[in-house]
Amino acid sequence: MRQTEILLLLGVFVVGLFVVYWLKKHRHARHNQALAAQLKRYPSVRKAWLAAGAKREAVLLVPGLKKATAAVATTATAKAETRLYKHADQCQAMTPQGLAVSEDYLFLSAYCSQQEHHSQLYIIERTSGRHLKTVVLPKRPHVGGLVFDRATQVLWLTITGKGMGRVACVSLQTLLEDDSLATSQPIAYQQVIELAGITHSSYLAADSGELVSGTFALKNGGVVANYPLPVLSDSGRKASPRIKPRKRRVTTTKVQSVAFTTEYLLLARSFGPRSAELWVFSKDATVLTRKHALRRIKFPHYLEQIVVEKGQLYCLFESGAWAYRQKGGSIDEVVVLDLATLLQ
């Protein structure tokens, strides 16, 4: 190949790289502009979002919101349609619920609001925002909370229980090697554990080596409890199938999630199209109700799980889901806030 042709090909390659970079930067800027407009009604949140800008990773879009996503059917009707049209089933009603963060990945959980498909986990690369894979979960749990335990490299998630809370876990290695979407065979949990002291596990968090799980209640308040983090030994011996709470606390209504800093307990309170709130409590508060909150911060509606990560607050919303999108103000990405700015 002549030198002129080599230089021409090299020039085309460089131009191509520039175009890809420009398109990515333009798309990022467009998302930022849209989100900035959404946050105008929430000055504290907007200020914290802008403060996180220099540290912000790629746009962390939630899969399956603006278009249908591949899914595995659970109902006879949906399965029949899959066979009839001879293609992988598609779900337009996946609704995001849980969020967890590891060094390299974001984990998002979602359930089908039409109750036709298995619940799912999405694994997203933190640095690029790329959706790496979808993991199919057994049955149709709400999966309202996730926790990633970095010490054991295990993901914990809430699942449907019978009269008490229930959580399950899967190792990171198993998740990364999973092919459940291709095979239509849901992933198998490594362990399922019942949480005594609460009627169901609506949300999940971790603090100081403990799992923290609580119940969502619409009218009469709920309960949140701390549990010793189950130890899963390398020998294959499973943890106790049921654990008792170390302590329990009464909560306000409409609690979607909790998270912890060294000083504070943060409580996400949200239900329906009205603005959500983040309530700030002393970490040792024994009652988590309005009069005990140190501060209440107005947030966009449909706030779900919040996660504290290295001075930032990761926030997941379900407003971009098909069931709520028409109500306006949808947020399609994980919003990252500077925590010090938010709490100042």
Indicate where each model-derived feature is located:
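Blade-loop segments of beta-propeller domains
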Residues: G129-T152
